[in-house]
Design a protein with these regions (language model features):
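Structural recognition of alpha->loop->beta junctions
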Residues: 120-130, 190-207
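Non-catalytic pre-domain segments flanking phosphatase-related domains
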Residues: 1-7, 157, 213-217
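N-terminal helical cap/lid subdomain that shapes the substrate entry/recognition surface
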Residues: 2-89, 93-97
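Acidic, Mg2+-coordinating phosphoryl-transfer loop and its flanking beta/alpha structural elements
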Residues: 159-198
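Substrate-recognition/cap helix-loop segment adjacent to the acidic, metal-dependent catalytic center
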Residues: 29-31, 51-59, 80, 88, ...
């Protein structure tokens, strides 16, 4: 029985895809580095900002790139992010059913809170684990285990919901069932290769998982 659901943020419950892609393109251009296509950027999304910028630039020290990224990201945050269908109504219903909820993300806390507040989702979250709250981010199990410890819940009665490969890997390493979202830019076929316990095509599919533990496919 699922008693707690942990959500990734970007690309899972808040549509930050265009903001993230635009921020990377800006950072590379501003620092006179070769440009990348969306298709080159998307596979890396979900890992830490440093890891992504290092992969894109070949640089170990990405501090200047991170500054460019965050500057663009903050400036264009509200205009470039959006919501996914039925997220709010699903959160409200899960809360009504007594399901506890939290966030596990590789974002920093300020932008995490900003996005949650913008879409009125913060009120549902009992714990928020960001990249600065852990020593080892996803795909390591530490972020998921930190959230579980904060909530004092059983890993086997917890569900992780995410849009990226590292979400699946982190949850599995923590001994937590995981649902991958079919609206991920990575593509459902790619996510299936990493064997999530569930694939959901609509946020309301979580009702059935909570009720029966029946796989959605």
């Amino acid at each position: 029985m699922i008693e707690c659901i942990l959500f990734d943020l970007d690309g899972t419950i808040v549509n930050t895809n265009e903001l993230i892609i635009g921020s990377f393109m800006h950072a590379l251009k501003e620092n006179n580095l070769p440009s990348l296509t969306r298709e080159q950027i998307i596979p890396h999304m979900g890992t830490t900002l440093h890891q992504q910028l290092s992969a894109f630039s070949g640089l170990e020290d990405t501090s200047v790139l991170e500054k460019s990224y965050r500057s663009y990201n903050y400036a264009h945050h509200d205009e470039l992010i959006g919501s996914f269908p039925r997220v709010n109504e699903t959160m409200e219903e899960l809360s009504r059913r007594g399901i506890r909820m939290g966030i596990v993300t590789t974002k920093i806390r300020p932008t995490t809170l900003k996005a949650l507040e913008m879409f009125d989702l913060l009120k549902y979250m009992e714990t928020i684990v960001t990249v600065t709250d852990v020593t080892q981010p996803k795909p390591h199990p530490e972020p998921v285990l930190t959230a579980i410890r904060n909530l004092e819940v059983d890993p086997q009665h917890t569900l992780m919901v995410g849009d990226s490969i590292v979400d699946i890997q982190s949850a599995k390493a923590a001994g937590v069932p995981v649902a991958a979202v079919a609206w991920s830019l990575k593509g459902e076929e790619t996510l299936r290769k990493y064997e999530p316990d569930y694939i959901i095509h609509d946020m309301t599919d979580l009702y059935e998982i909570v009720r029966q533990g029946t796989k959605e496919s």
